[in-house]
Curated annotation (Swiss-Prot):
The lineage of its organism: Eukaryota, Viridiplantae, Streptophyta, Embryophyta, Tracheophyta. Gene3D superfamilies: 3.30.530.20, Homeodomain-like (1.10.10.60). Residues 253-484 form the START domain. Pfam families: Homeodomain, START. Probable transcription factor involved in cell specification and pattern formation during embryogenesis. Binds to the L1 box DNA sequence 5'-TAAATG[CT]A-3'. Plays a role in maintaining the identity of L1 cells, possibly by interacting with their L1 box or other target-gene promoters; binds to the LIP1 gene promoter and stimulates its expression upon imbibition. Acts as a positive regulator of gibberellins (GAs)-regulated epidermal gene expression (e.g. LIP1, LIP2, LTP1, FDH and PDF1). Functionally redundant to PDF2. Seems to promote cell differentiation. This is Homeobox-leucine zipper protein MERISTEM L1. Residues 30-39 have a biased composition (Basic and acidic residues). It comes from the Eukaryota. Belongs to the HD-ZIP homeobox family. Class IV subfamily. It is found in: Nucleus. It comes from Arabidopsis thaliana (Mouse-ear cress).
Length: 762
């Protein structure tokens, strides 16, 4: 039966605002004030069902009754709201029983609380938008004043628009197009300029050995290398002290930012043309290597960062390949400093984002602009690192085609000495079908490389040390590693193959941390928690030390790191296969002590059988010695190879293989970095023959072949690096005997390798 007062009754049931000041509590004021002070959380109806139960013929009470919730009820409701702001019927009934409230009282409390939070957020956002609008209006007024007071640079009189020649008109159109893009980026950057950086990257001078750097490890999700915690720091290892570049750069000033934006736009245009243009900019030589025509380059790009400084040598290379990763995830890797330094940990020894000028638009990185600094290395103590201070700019050019460019900001650095600078360098990424992408990489560097050891100069001059081929080869291998780690259809034909997804993920995460830790001690970087002790005479053994405390990923105590590089007249592939083979391990590994080495577990990491993670067991001939496990990762690509290993605890590895957390497994990695010597040019299908990057040029090919060198294609540059715990007490003093022992160990290993590979006189 229809009752005319029924809907009026329901209206009063939902109306929480007192109609007059004569309520039971004496609450006065407007609805908004009542909402602000009571927030619907402290005041509610005494019996919300009372009006529905009234006789429909009776008039509803005009005066509704309210009562306050107790302090305990409010605390419980607030606590539950933080966990679940939208409780279901079952949860509301449970709360009503616990707090002695009606279910509808609980329901209305949550409704009012959500409304209050929404209103507070809207007011806060409105205040921010109003502040930004005021800033834009003020900036617009400054521009108007500047235009009204503009003067002619020639005569000093008022500026006037006169007749333009045909060429001048075209220049003005081109300038207008570039200015439009600059204004668009500036408008985006205006929203973010001046925002404080994250706590762990707020200021360079404050970085020290006690500075906490979050660990980054492979998260095994497409496009998510490392824990993306939005940190602006990307370290392969911990930072110890300030290197030259850390002392010479700072966050750019407000006056510098318009110039940075303009430079980034010009660099993007240059990179796209460098990646897509052939002759006469890139000239092909007889051995299919492209040489950059510097005269044509400066004629084509008269703008940019200026002429080449005296004393610097140009390196330019270009390389293309197809990788098994979609373009969106590739862009994310390049624009996130943590993921970038993790994926390229063998090249990037340290990276920092100084300031994010723009985060992009439309929920992606289109238009993203950030000022960065990075240190690039070769896995050898004999090759100095290269430090750059640059801006990185990402732009979508068309549907499915993106570009990321770096260009140095040396003009903003107070340091008068420039040892290395990046002309527009980066990559074009083209979307392909089935989740693949085509990557065209351009590296254009000007560097003072006179400090490079003579043994490594041929490698550096071919472009394999820092050129585009090394970047592309590393990216291709890492994409294969990620794709292999995510495979679900693993055949169980081999008992040593790990088929459990959880076990594979944990073991790969542990291996990745081992590789990254190895890279901190193998190169010439000084930006990590190592103190260099000495380089011992003609043997060129670089010894460093560090104290490990409160780090679950490393054993506590004093750790020594020793590294040395030498040349052997053996092809890189033969050296790589010898060092990664467990059957030949006893020929060089003192830890195996002549025992039988057996592979217990295995994870393939790509097409090449040399790319894998293995768990080895050393069965010592001494019955009194317990068996030992060794975690090993071997990887190879067209630019070089690694064999990295570390002794691990048996109990801890059982936890890892069961899918447990690998971050608490203590590791001290040792291993080898194998590079071609740069002497072979062309033929043989070798890694160094296909380097394709000369002093001024680089090769281009759609496919990167794996290392397939033969004995006739030149020798190898082998770097051996050990990390050894010499004292389990972190506060103990380092003894000279410990240094001598580590030196003896590394020399003995080198001699064993030379003898096993028959390198007499090497």
């Amino acid at each position: 039966m229809y009752h005319p007062n029924m809907f009026e009754s329901h209206h009063h049931m939902f109306d929480m605002t007192p109609k007059n000041s004569e309520n039971d509590l004496g609450i006065t004021g407007s609805h908004e004030e009542d909402f602000e002070t009571k927030s619907g959380a402290e005041v509610t109806m005494e019996n919300p069902l009372e009006e529905e139960l009234q006789d429909p013929n009776q008039r509803p009470n005009k005066k509704k009754r309210y009562h306050r919730h107790t302090q305990r009820q409010i605390q419980e409701l607030e606590s539950f709201f933080k966990e679940c702001p939208h409780p279901d019927d079952k949860q509301r009934k449970e709360l009503s029983r616990e707090l002695s409230l009606e279910p509808l009282q609980v329901k209305f409390w949550f409704q009012n609380k959500r409304t209050q939070m929404k209103a507070q957020h809207e007011r806060h956002e409105n205040q921010i938008l109003k502040s930004e609008n005021d800033k834009l209006r003020a900036e617009n007024n400054r521009y108007k004043d500047a235009l009204s007071n503009a003067t002619c640079p020639n005569c000093g009189g008022p500026a006037a628009i006169g007749e333009m020649s045909f060429d001048e008109q075209h220049l003005r159109i081109e300038n207008a197009r570039l200015r439009e893009e600059i204004d668009r980026i500036s408008a985006i950057a205006a929203k973010y300029v001046g925002k404080p950086l994250m706590a762990n990257s707020s200021s360079f001078p404050q970085l020290s050995s006690s500075h906490h750097i979050p660990s980054r490890s492979l998260d095994l999700e497409v496009g998510n290398f490392g824990n993306n915690n939005n940190s602006h720091t990307g370290f392969v290892g911990e930072m110890f002290g300030s290197s030259d570049i850390l002392r010479s750069v700072s966050i750019p000033s407000e006056a510098d930012k318009p110039m940075i934006v303009e430079l980034a736009v010009a660099a993007m245009e240059e990179l796209v043309r460098m990646a897509q243009t052939g002759d006469p900019l890139w000239v092909s030589s007889d051995n299919s290597v492209e040489i950059l025509n510097e005269e044509e380059y400066f004629r084509t790009f008269p703008r940019g960062i200026g002429p080449k400084p005296i004393g610097l040598r140009s390196e330019a290379s270009r390389e293309s390949t197809v990788v098994i990763m979609n373009h969106i995830n590739l862009i994310e890797i390049l624009m996130d400093v943590n993921q970038w330094s993790s994926v390229f940990c063998g090249i990037v020894s340290r990276a920092l984002t100084l300031e994010v000028l723009s985060t992009g638009v439309a929920g992606n990185y289109n238009g993203a602009l950030q000022v960065m600094t990075a240190e690039f290395q070769v896995p050898s103590p004999l090759v100095p690192t290269r430090e750059n201070y640059f801006v990185r700019y990402c732009k979508q050019h068309s549907d499915g085609i993106w570009a990321v460019v770096d260009v140095s900001l040396d003009s903003l650095r107070p340091s008068p000495i420039t040892r290395s600078r990046r002309r527009p360098s980066g990559c074009l990424i083209q979307e392909l079908q089935n989740g693949y992408s085509k990557v065209t990489w351009v590296e254009h560097i000007e560097v003072d490389d006179r400090s490079v050891h003579n043994m490594y100069k041929p490698l550096v001059n071919t472009g394999l040390a820092f050129g585009a081929k090394r970047w592309v080869a590393t990216l291709d291998r890492q994409c294969e590693r990620l794709a292999s780690s995510m495979a679900s259809n693993i055949p169980a034909c081999d008992l040593s193959v790990i088929t459990s997804p959880e076990g594979r993920k944990s073991m790969l995460k542990l291996a990745e941390r081992m590789v990254m830790s190895f890279c901190t001690g193998v190169g010439a970087s000084t930006a990590h928690a190592w103190t260099t002790l000495s380089t011992t005479g003609s043997d060129d053994v670089r010894v460093m030390t560090r104290k490990s405390m409160d780090d679950p990923g490393r054993p506590p105590g004093i750790v020594l790191s020793a590294a040395t590089s030498f040349w052997i007249p053996v092809a890189p592939k033969r050296v790589f296969d010898f060092l990664r083979d467990e059957n030949s391990r006893s020929e060089w590994d003192i830890l195996s002590n002549g025992g039988l080495v057996q592979e217990m577990a295995h994870i393939a990491n790509g097409r090449d059988p040399g790319n894998s993670v293995s768990l080895l067991r050393v069965n010592s001939g001494n019955s009194g010695q317990s068996n030992m496990l060794i975690l090993q990762e071997s990887c190879t690509d067209a630019s070089g190879s690694y064999v990295i290993y570390a002794p691990v605890d048996i109990i801890a590895m059982n936890v890892v293989l069961s899918g447990g957390d690998p971050d608490y497994v203590a590791l001290l990695p040792s291993g080898f970095a194998i590079l071609p010597d740069g002497s072979a040019r062309g033929g043989g299908g070798s890694a160094n023959a296909s380097a394709g990057a000369g002093v001024e040029g680089g090769g281009e090919g759609n496919n990167l072949e794996v290392v397939t060198t033969t004995g006739s294609c030149g020798g190898s540059l082998l770097t051996v690096a050990f990390q050894i715990l010499v004292d389990s007490v972190p506060t103990a003093k380092l003894s000279l005997g410990s240094v001598a022992t580590v030196n003896s160990l590394i020399k003995c290993t080198v001699e064993r390798i030379k003898a096993a590979l028959a390198c007499d006189g090497a």
